[in-house]
Curated annotation (Swiss-Prot):
GO terms for biological process: B cell homeostasis; cortical cytoskeleton organization; microtubule cytoskeleton organization; positive regulation of B cell differentiation; regulation of dephosphorylation; T cell homeostasis. It comes from Danio rerio (Zebrafish). This is Serine/threonine-protein phosphatase 2A regulatory subunit B'' subunit gamma. Possible role in the regulation of cell death. Residues 276-311, 344-379 form the EF-hand domain. It is found in: Nucleus; Cytoplasm. Gene3D superfamilies: 1.10.238.220, EF-hand.
C-alpha cells in the first residue's frame, strides 16, 4: 500500500517538473493557441456549432455576422479589435517630422536644370530618395507613381512639388478615412446620419471660420451640413453613405477649407458649409415662417426666392415630400433648397423629376408637361402678360432634350441632354420661364453693358 502511494507521488512530481521546463514555442505560436482556445471555449459557452457541414473546414469564410445586442462580449471584442486596427493604420502614416524629412531629401536630390521655378528630380534620384526615406515611404516610390506624374519634361523628370503634393494628399486621405472610420459604429464602411452628425459636431471647434457661431446654432449648422452629404450621396434614401463616397466627392474639401483663417468673402459665400451660407439658409427659413411655429405651410413656402414658383408645383412638393400635418420641417426644407439651387446636378434633377412625374411612370409625357405649364400660363395672365402657346414650348422642350422615345422624357434623358435645369425652370417657375423666353434680349443687354465698360476704360 505504502509502495503504491510512493509511486503515485513520484509520478505527480515528475509531471510537475516536466511542466516547469521552459516552453520552446514562439510568441506567435502561443498567441495562436490562445486564440484557438478562446474560440473553442466561447463556442462551447454559446452552445456549440450544431450540424456543421464538413465543407466549412475547406471553404473560406466570407460573411461575418454583426453581433446582436445581447452579445455584449462579441460587441466589446469587435470594438476593441477595430480600435487597435485603426491605431495601427494611423501609426503607419507619415507624421509632420517625417514629411519635413522627405521634403529635405527631395530638395537635396533635385536634378538641374529647373523648369521655370520648379525643382525637378530624375527617376534614378527618385529611387535613391526612396531608399533613404524609410519604410513608411516605400509605397510612394514606385514606377507607377513616377509615371503618373511624368509629363512633358525633355529629360524624363518629374516635379518635386507635384510629387510632394501627391504624398501629402494621400496621407490626408488616409488620415481622414481613419478619422471617419472612428465614427462608423457598425464597422461596415459607411456612416449613418447620426454618425456623420457626431463627426461634424466634433469638427466644428477645429474650423476657425466657424468660431463666430453661437453654440445654440450648432444643431442647425450640423443639420444643414449633413443634409448636403445625404442629398447628393444617398439618392436612394438608404440612411447611410459609404466612407469611400465621402472621400471621393469634394464636400469634405469644402468643409475642411474652413480651416483657412484668411478665406475670402467670395469663397465663403459660395461654400455651403460656411457660416454665412448656413446662416443665410436658416435665416430664409425663419423669414418664411410667418406664424413662428417652426414649420412651413404651403402658403409660407410660396414666398420662397422670387415668389414665382407655381402653386401646382408646390402642391406636388407637399404631396411627395415628408411633412407633418401638412407642414414642412427644416430638414425637408434643406432638401428643397439643395434641389432648386443645384438644378444642373443629377441628384437635384431626380428630386424635381419625381415631383413632375405625377403618375410615377418613370417618364414625362405631353400631358405632364401641359399640366405644369398651364400654371405658368395662368401666372402670366395675372401679371398682364400674353400667355405663350404650349405647343411651341412643348416642341422646344423636346428639341432641347432629344429623348430616345420622341413621346417620353425620362430622367436619364434630362441628365444626358444637359438641359435639365432649363426644362425644370420652364415648368415650375415663372421667373425661370421668363428668363428662358427673353434669353436673347438678356444676352444682348450683357454684351452692350460689357462694351460700354470697355469704352469707359
Amino acid at each position: 500500500m505504502a509502495n503504491d502511494i510512493t509511486a503515485h507521488w513520484k509520478d505527480l512530481l515528475r509531471k510537475r517538473l516536466a511542466s516547469l521546463k521552459p516552453d520552446g514555442r514562439t510568441e506567435e505560436e502561443k498567441k495562436a493557441e490562445e486564440s484557438e482556445l478562446f474560440s473553442k471555449y466561447y463556442t462551447e459557452w454559446k452552445g456549440g456549432e450544431k450540424g456543421e457541414d464538413d465543407s466549412f473546414k475547406h471553404i473560406p469564410r466570407f460573411y461575418y455576422r454583426l453581433p446582436a445586442e445581447d452579445e455584449v462580449l462579441m460587441q466589446k471584442l469587435r470594438e476593441e479589435s477595430r480600435a487597435v486596427f485603426l491605431q495601427r493604420k494611423s501609426r503607419e502614416l507619415l507624421d509632420n517630422e517625417e514629411l519635413q524629412n522627405l521634403w529635405f531629401l527631395l530638395d537635396k536630390h533635385q536634378v538641374p536644370p529647373t523648369t521655370g521655378d520648379e525643382a525637378m528630380i530624375s527617376y534614378e534620384s527618385f529611387l535613391k530618395v526612396g531608399e533613404k526615406a524609410g519604410t513608411k515611404c516605400k509605397l510612394f516610390f514606385t514606377a507607377r507613381v513616377y509615371a503618373k506624374l511624368l509629363h512633358n519634361d525633355p529629360y524624363g523628370r518629374i516635379s518635386i512639388m507635384q510629387f510632394f503634393n501627391y504624398v501629402m494628399r494621400k496621407v490626408w486621405l488616409h488620415q481622414t478615412r481613419i478619422g471617419l472610420s472612428l465614427y462608423d459604429v457598425a464597422g461596415q464602411g459607411y456612416l449613418r446620419e447620426s454618425d456623420l452628425e457626431n463627426y461634424i459636431l466634433e469638427l466644428i471647434p477645429t474650423l476657425p471660420q466657424l468660431d463666430g457661431l453661437e453654440k445654440s446654432f450648432y444643431s442647425f449648422y450640423v443639420c444643414t451640413a449633413v443634409r448636403k452629404f445625404f442629398f447628393f450621396l444617398d439618392p436612394l434614401h438608404t440612411g447611410k453613405i459609404k466612407i469611400q463616397d465621402i472621400l471621393a466627392c469634394s464636400f469634405l474639401d469644402d468643409l475642411l477649407e474652413l480651416r483657412d483663417e484668411e478665406l475670402s468673402k467670395e469663397s465663403q459665400e459660395s461654400n455651403w458649409f460656411s457660416a454665412p451660407s448656413a446662416l443665410r439658409v436658416y435665416g430664409q427659413y425663419l423669414n418664411l415662417d410667418k406664424d413662428h411655429n417652426g414649420m412651413l405651410s404651403k402658403e409660407e413656402l410660396s414666398r420662397y426666392g422670387t415668389g414665382t414658383l407655381t402653386s401646382v408645383f408646390l402642391d406636388r412638393v407637399y404631396q411627395a415630400c415628408l411633412t407633418y400635418d401638412g407642414e414642412m420641417d427644416y430638414k425637408t426644407y434643406l432638401d428643397f433648397v439643395l434641389a432648386l439651387e443645384n438644378r444642373k446636378e443629377p441628384a437635384a434633377l431626380q428630386y424635381i423629376f419625381k415631383l413632375l412625374d405625377m403618375e410615377n411612370k418613370g417618364y414625362l409625357n405631353v400631358f405632364a408637361l401641359n399640366y405644369f405649364f398651364r400654371a405658368i400660363q395662368e401666372q402670366m395672365k395675372i401679371h398682364g402678360q400674353e400667355p405663350v402657346s404650349f405647343q411651341d414650348v412643348k416642341d422646344e422642350i423636346f428639341d432641347m432634350v432629344k429623348p430616345k422615345d420622341p413621346y417620353k422624357i425620362t430622367l436619364q434623358d434630362l441628365v444626358n441632354s444637359g438641359q435639365g435645369d432649363t426644362v425644370s425652370s420652364i415648368l415650375i417657375d415663372l421667373n425661370g420661364f421668363w428668363t428662358y423666353e427673353n434669353r436673347e434680349v438678356l444676352v444682348a443687354n450683357d454684351t452692350d453693358s460689357n462694351a460700354a465698360d470697355l469704352d469707359d476704360t
